[in-house]
Amino acid sequence: MTEPEKLKHLLKHWIEHNDAHVKTYDEWASKAGAFGNKELSGILKEIAEESRKLKGLFEKAIEAV
């Protein structure tokens, strides 16, 4: 496997890993809201949203390989 092929494979893996984290952030944002911590819930939602934006950058990186 060439270095660019390895990198493309890694980038796809990182997307999957990032998606899993987004799901976890969303779940904990809901839990934080349910136990009354609206501030924490909002922060976790913001983290999830920023992480969703990363997916687009990973996809751009794949295209650039």
Where are these regions (language model features)?
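N-terminal acidic leader/helix
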Residues: M1-D26
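Helix-loop segments that flank and shape redox-cofactor active sites
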Residues: M1-E3, Y25-L40
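Alpha-helical scaffold segments that form or flank carboxylate-/histidine-based iron centers
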Residues: L7-W14, L40-E50
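Alpha-helical transition-metal enzyme core signature, strongest for iron centers
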Residues: N18-V22, L44-F58
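Short hydrophobic/aromatic patches at helix-to-coil boundaries
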Residues: A61-V65
